[in-house]
Design a protein with these regions (language model features):
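Extracellular, beta-strand-rich glycan-interacting domains
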Residues: 1
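Extracytoplasmic
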Residues: 4-14, 19-202
Length: 202
């Protein structure tokens, strides 16, 4: 590792026994573990696990409909932007594990000219709660000041928490979605994360 920190040199012929051990271990893992995993994971996102009072629903794990785009192809630290139409949607196909009342908090940024829009939380087409964006919060991206070369991953920024009225969730499948209405200035919010904190258990 010290002589070749970038690991560019093939040293398998210098260490044939270790090389064969690694090949055997990989083959065993593929047969015993990888073979049991689906090529496409269709499991629903777990929401409201009984052992955890707060569920995090990040942009990283969400899907979208419409013109909303991710800040970067790499999901970690990414956020959603270019949210311009009422038909646009951010959603999670989830599974509620514990029924109850939950307090949503949305982490967003919004330019001054876009203040006044309404954010809706829904299950499929049923509105669970909604609120108006009354406060502008529009900090710049940061992180590039620490880079010696341009990073491939998303830059980050600070986010403003917005507390919404509690919502009632029943146990079972759910398609939890965010939509925007009364969009001002041709743009809704940038979105990073929604949390759901359990306040009452059914």
């Amino acid at each position: 590792m010290e002589k070749d920190p970038s690991q560019e040199q093939d040293v398998s012929s210098d260490y044939p026994i270790i090389h064969q051990q690694l090949i055997t271990a990989k083959s065993k893992w593929e047969k015993e573990v990888l073979s049991e995993l689906p090529k496409i994971d269709e499991r629903n996102f777990p929401i409201a696990h009984p052992d955890f009072p707060i569920t995090q629903l990040p942009a990283r794990d969400a899907k979208t409909i419409g013109g909303i785009i991710r800040s970067n192809r790499w999901p970690n630290c990414s956020f959603y932007t270019s949210w311009k139409k009422e038909e646009d949607k951010i959603y999670w196909k989830g599974e509620v594990l514990t029924a109850g009342q939950y307090q949503p908090v949305i982490y967003y940024t919004c330019a001054e000219e876009n203040v006044g829009l309404t954010i809706n939380i829904s299950d499929k087409n049923k509105i669970l709660t909604r609120t108006k964006i009354k406060e502008a919060f529009h900090p710049p991206l940061r992180g590039m000041e620490y880079d010696k070369i341009e990073r491939g991953e998303s830059y980050v920024k600070d986010w403003n928490p917005l507390v919404l009225n509690p919502i009632s969730l029943s146990k079972g499948p759910i398609e939890l979605a965010l939509t925007a209405s009364d969009i001002q200035g041709g743009q809704a919010i940038d979105f990073r994360l929604m949390t759901l904190e359990r306040v009452v258990t059914k």
